[in-house]
Amino acid sequence: YVARIVMQNIIKALSKPEDTAMVSIFVPGELLTAAGLTPYSVEAMSCFIAGTQCEQPFLRKTEEEGFPETMCSYHRVFLGASLTGLVPAPKCMVYTNLACDGNMMTFPYLKQKQELSGFYIDVPYEKNEDSIQYVAGQLRELKKYLEDMTGKKIAESAVQQAVANSKQAAEYYSRQLALRKDHDPVSTLTNELYAIFMCHLLAGSKESVTYTKLLLEDVKKAPKGEGLRILWMHMMPFLQQPVKEVFNYSDQMHISTCDFVADGFQKVHHEDPYEAMAEKMVNCIYNGSVGQRIEKAKELAQLTEADGGILFAHWGCKGTIGASGLIKNSLEASGLPTIILDGDGCNPANTSDGQVSTRLQAYMEMLKEAKSHDTLCL
């Protein structure tokens, strides 16, 4: 189900650009759902392109434009695809400074280069009520902007319904998460990646509610396995062969939860729909101090009774790479064996399959031994 929905989103974005909005991953999908626009993000489109194994020409195009190789590969592939015309110009773009510094290069550049209309959401570093109200005010302006771009009024009832859908999806997700310590559904890295799009790009849609409801039912039916439970942190390298071999349809290792997805399906408490969307943005674990990422990881590990944690340090993601040592040390101090897996979720040229395979296999053996003896010497 979720594969079909995500593919339909990409197809619509490519075939009907006049009805699409180019967005960064943390932009509230609820308002775009209410506006009737098809959102697509840098990460979603680049994953789709990389999945067809044709990312290299677009990476070269981006280099020709002067962008550094150290920039996030998701953004570099997307820029190249946009500049060569593969990704058609959208009706508008909506972006934010939240989490990814690549946003502040990609979106302003394409806005000027392709003369696109754009809306920017500024999310403060501080996590408090003032920040929530500040962002909520911008989201009310975003609604007006989308009305101007589409030429259609957005009913307040549509916004309220979209936010209500998000809250329902978050409830279903929370319920299945609580069951994970006793149920181990067999899945794939790609399915886990799709979940990221459902909690952000398609937030507020009926499809997101259906997805989380089906996920809950699948988890309920799944038996408890003998394999290792893993807390995954950050993006999914769904194309990398050694990672696929370890996790796809495996009864040896299960991704019990991913912090990126759990954060996207976080529970919000404000009743006002704009304040609720703002709360989700401000309280995002990738905003502010790394301390919240660490605490969220500990919470998820305890809830799912994870045997270990894997932090994927994606090429060019300066925030995650810079914080990786602190995250690893903090989690291991709390008793969760953690490995930092360096790689690239979009460009296979930036990683070594052999090295990744060796490290993953060694880590898996270490966790198996620890589980069999119910102890681990760090």
Residue ranges and their predicted role:
Residues 21-30, 97-103, 233-240, 315-322:
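Gly/Ser/Thr-rich loops at beta-strand to alpha-helix junctions
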Residues 1-46:
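N-terminal signal-anchor module of multipass membrane proteins
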Residues 1-19, 136, 140, 144-267, ...:
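A charged, amphipathic alpha-helical module
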